[in-house]
C-alpha cells in the first residue's frame, strides 16, 4: 500500500515549532522580522505575498510588506533592499519574483544581505550549499521542504540510495541535488537533454520531479517502492468537472504512479505547503543567528 506523504500535516508541525521558538526569542527581546517586497500588480504574486505575510503574522513575526508600482526603477528597488539590509528589526528579506523587465533580478538578489536572504538565492548561500556547508546556508525553501518529506520516509542518512532529480533550475533542481548529496545519496540530475529519461528514472529509490510539465512522469518510469516527490504544479483542463473547469496536477501522472511507488506526494497538498513553512523556518533561523542563539533544528 502506497504511503501518501501529507505535506500539509508536516508543514503544520514545522509552523507550530516556529511559533514556539518565536515565543522564546521574543521573551529574550528578539522579534523575528520578515520584509516582503513586491513590484507590480501580477495577481499570482499578490496572492503569494499575501499568504506569506499572513503566515508570518500567525507565527508571531514582525511582518512588513513593501508594494511598489510596475514602473519602479532598478535603482529604486536596490535602495529599498539596502535600507532593509541596514534595518536591525528585519531578519529576512524576500523580493517576490518575477520582477518587471526593466529590473535585473540577479542584481536584486545579490543586493540582499546573505544573512537575510531567506529565499536562499544569494550566491553565498548557493555556494555554501554547493560545498556541503548545509547548516551554514539559508537553503531555498522548496527543496528544503521536499528534503524534510524525504527524511520522513527514508531517514536523514540516505547512504546506498539512488536519487534522480528531474530538473536543473537554480531554485529547485540544483539545490535539491546538493541536499541529497549532503545526505549521502548517489545523485543524478536529469533534464530535457537527458537521453532516455524514463530509463534514468527507473533506477531511482528517490525520484524528485521539478520541471513544470504536467503528468510527464509515467507509472512505468518509477522503480517499485520508490519515494516520489512531485514539485511541479500545473493547471490543466478538467472536462470531467464540467465545461471550462480546470484542475491542479503535478509533473507525475499520479493515478499511475501511486500503484508503483512506495511513497508519493500529492498535488496539491504535498510539497506546496512545505515551501511557505520553510520560509518561516528560514526567517526564524536568520533571527536566531543574528541574536547569537542556537539555530532551531527541523
UniProtKB/Swiss-Prot annotation:
Gene3D superfamilies referenced in this protein's UniProt entry, alphabetically: Leucine Dehydrogenase, chain A, domain 1, NAD(P)-binding Rossmann-like Domain
Record-listed E.C. numbers: 1.5.1.5, 3.5.4.9
UniProt-listed PROSITE patterns: THF_DHG_CYH_1, THF_DHG_CYH_2
The keyword NADP belongs to this UniProt entry's keyword annotation: yes
PANTHER family associated with the record: C-1-TETRAHYDROFOLATE SYNTHASE, CYTOPLASMIC, C-1-TETRAHYDROFOLATE SYNTHASE, CYTOPLASMIC-RELATED
Annotated positions binding NADP(+): 167-169, 192, 233
Source taxon at top rank: Bacteria
Native organism: Chelativorans sp. (strain BNC1)
Function: Catalyzes the oxidation of 5,10-methylenetetrahydrofolate to 5,10-methenyltetrahydrofolate and then the hydrolysis of 5,10-methenyltetrahydrofolate to 10-formyltetrahydrofolate.
Any single biological process term in GO: tetrahydrofolate interconversion
NCBIfam families: PRK14188.1
Name of the coding gene: folD
Keywords noted in UniProt: Amino-acid biosynthesis, Histidine biosynthesis, Hydrolase, Methionine biosynthesis, Multifunctional enzyme, NADP, One-carbon metabolism, Oxidoreductase, Purine biosynthesis
GO molecular function: methenyltetrahydrofolate cyclohydrolase activity; methylenetetrahydrofolate dehydrogenase (NADP+) activity
Catalysed reaction equations from the record: (6R)-5,10-methylene-5,6,7,8-tetrahydrofolate + NADP(+) = (6R)-5,10-methenyltetrahydrofolate + NADPH; (6R)-5,10-methenyltetrahydrofolate + H2O = (6R)-10-formyltetrahydrofolate + H(+)
Family: Belongs to the tetrahydrofolate dehydrogenase/cyclohydrolase family.
Quaternary structure and interacting proteins, as annotated: Homodimer.
The protein, known as: Bifunctional protein FolD
SUPFAM superfamilies for the chain: Aminoacid dehydrogenase-like, N-terminal domain, NAD(P)-binding Rossmann-fold domains
Annotated metabolic or biological route of this protein: One-carbon metabolism; tetrahydrofolate interconversion
A cellular-component GO term for this protein: cytosol
Amino acid at each position: 500500500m502506497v504511503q501518501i506523504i501529507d505535506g500539509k500535516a508536516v508543514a503544520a508541525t514545522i509552523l507550530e515549532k516556529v511559533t514556539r521558538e518565536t515565543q522564546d526569542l521574543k521573551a529574550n527581546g528578539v522579534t523575528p522580522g520578515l520584509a516582503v517586497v513586491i513590484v507590480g500588480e501580477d495577481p499570482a504574486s499578490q496572492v503569494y505575498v499575501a499568504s506569506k505575510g499572513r503566515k508570518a503574522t500567525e507565527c508571531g513575526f514582525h511582518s512588513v510588506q513593501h508594494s511598489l508600482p510596475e514602473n519602479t526603477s532598478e535603482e529604486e528597488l536596490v535602495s529599498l533592499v539596502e535600507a532593509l539590509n541596514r534595518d536591525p528589526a528585519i531578519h529576512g528579506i524576500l523580493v517576490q519574483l518575477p520582477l518587471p523587465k526593466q529590473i535585473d533580478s540577479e542584481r536584486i538578489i545579490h543586493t540582499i544581505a546573505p544573512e537575510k536572504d531567506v529565499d536562499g538565492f544569494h550566491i553565498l548561500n548557493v555556494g555554501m550549499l554547493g560545498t556541503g556547508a548545509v547548516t551554514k546556508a539559508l537553503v531555498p525553501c522548496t527543496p528544503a521542504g521536499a528534503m524534510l518529506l524525504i527524511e520522513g520516509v527514508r531517514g536523514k542518512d540516505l547512504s546506498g540510495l539512488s536519487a534522480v532529480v528531474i530538473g536543473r533550475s537554480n531554485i529547485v533542481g540544483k539545490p535539491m541535488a546538493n541536499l541529497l548529496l549532503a545526505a549521502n545519496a548517489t545523485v543524478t540530475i536529469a533534464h530535457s537533454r537527458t537521453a532516455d529519461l524514463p530509463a534514468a528514472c527507473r533506477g531511482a529509490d528517490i525520484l524528485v520531479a521539478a520541471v513544470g510539465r504536467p503528468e510527464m512522469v509515467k507509472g512505468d518510469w518509477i522503480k517499485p517502492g520508490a519515494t516520489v516527490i512531485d514539485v511541479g504544479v500545473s493547471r490543466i483542463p478538467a472536462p470531467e468537472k464540467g465545461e471550462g473547469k480546470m484542475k491542479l496536477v503535478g509533473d507525475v501522472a499520479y493515478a499511475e504512479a501511486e500503484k508503483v511507488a512506495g511513497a508519493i506526494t500529492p498535488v496539491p497538498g504535498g510539497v506546496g505547503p512545505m515551501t511557505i513553512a520553510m520560509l518561516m523556518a528560514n526567517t526564524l533561523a536568520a533571527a536566531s543567528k543574528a541574536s547569537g542563539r542556537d539555530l532551531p533544528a527541523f
